[in-house]
Regions:
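Long, amphipathic alpha-helical surface segments
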Residues: 1-26, 34-41, 46-65, 85-142
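Structural motif
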Residues: 66-73
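Short N-proximal segments of mature Sec-exported proteins
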Residues: 74-87
């Protein structure tokens, strides 16, 4: 597995916090966008330190799950944090995204595929598009 530099990981954390914002009253999301899983008892009024720790644990877990993508692991993990791991990599009846198909084929020309994850209910959302462009600019390494 490719080692992710701490500075790059910190940029991903800052980027997620910036665009995700604080989820204080939006269950099932808490903290910086953590989706509550069955059995979890995190509360919307958690401290910022607790939420930061949870975000880091979530992103590290996703990085491990995405480690097969080498230097693109952090980029794919950051996208997965927001849209869901299986929507990106596929599972069962959910097909692999075009982004993953290209990466698996060794094609790293993925800007358009990455930024295509910018819709909500079938419509392009400008703020999500901005987020994808910033994530790509910060985290894609040649």
């Amino acid at each position: 597995a490719t080692e992710i530099p701490d500075s790059l990981f910190e940029q991903a954390i800052a980027c997620i916090k910036r665009f995700e914002g604080w989820h204080g009253k939006h269950l099932p999301y808490v903290g910086w966008g953590h989706k509550l899983l069955p059995g979890e008892t995190f509360r919307p009024d958690m401290s910022k330190a607790q939420a930061d720790s949870l975000l880091r644990a979530d992103l590290r877990k996703l990085c491990r799950m995405c480690s097969r993508f080498g230097k693109d692991a952090l980029l794919v993990a950051t996208l997965s944090y927001n849209v869901g791991y299986y929507r990106v990599v596929g599972y069962g009846k959910i097909p692999k995204s075009r982004l993953i198909q290209k990466l698996e084929a060794g094609d790293r020309d993925i800007y358009n595929e990455y930024v295509s994850f910018r819709c909500y209910k079938g419509k392009v959302v400008p703020s999500i598009e901005r987020r994808r462009k910033v994530e790509y600019m910060l985290l894609f390494k040649k």
